[in-house]
Amino acid sequence: METLFSLPFTVLECPNVKLKKPSWLHMPSAMTVYAVVIVSYFLITGGIIYDVIVEPPSVGSMTDEHGHQRPVAFLAYRVNGQYIMEGLASSFLFTMGGLGFIILDRSNAPNIPKLNRFLLLFIGFVSVLLSFFMARVFMRMKLPGYLMG
């Protein structure tokens, strides 16, 4: 394998380039990287790529039995389609659940006082459980009759 990789370099000569890092470029802090990851996770799980390509409306409308137009936030019976508000709400729940797991992990630090540990555990569990059960409610709204035992 080594001979296979070195074969092109018997003919080609690598240039002697000396690159320096610009002085204004610094390593970002951990919280900056964390914020970028969370925001990108929020946008990707919200379906920003789908929203840009398909350009769905922010909310839909449904005609009730009296002939009145009623706004709806969920595109029912369509797994492969969504309104913008539906994607943002689901994305918020997924991000809240992920942050709940991170809060639960942070509650294991050895130097946290007992009250703060209890509060972190409580907030983490509430975030994870709330996001899980609300995602199930959203699935029930999206696909009526699904997950009905």
Swiss-Prot record:
Topology in the lipid bilayer is annotated as: Multi-pass membrane protein
The name this protein goes by in its record: Oligosaccharyltransferase complex subunit ostc
Side of membrane Cytoplasmic, spans: 1-32, 105-117
This protein's pathway: Protein modification; protein glycosylation
Reported function: Specific component of the STT3A-containing form of the oligosaccharyl transferase (OST) complex that catalyzes the initial transfer of a defined glycan (Glc(3)Man(9)GlcNAc(2) in eukaryotes) from the lipid carrier dolichol-pyrophosphate to an asparagine residue within an Asn-X-Ser/Thr consensus motif in nascent polypeptide chains, the first step in protein N-glycosylation. N-glycosylation occurs cotranslationally and the complex associates with the Sec61 complex at the channel-forming translocon complex that mediates protein translocation across the endoplasmic reticulum (ER).
Q: Which family does it belong to?
A: Belongs to the OSTC family.
GO cellular component: a single term: oligosaccharyltransferase complex
One BP term from GO: protein glycosylation
What are the leading ranks of the lineage?
Eukaryota, Metazoa, Chordata, Craniata, Vertebrata
Q: Which UniProt keywords apply?
A: Membrane, Transmembrane, Transmembrane helix
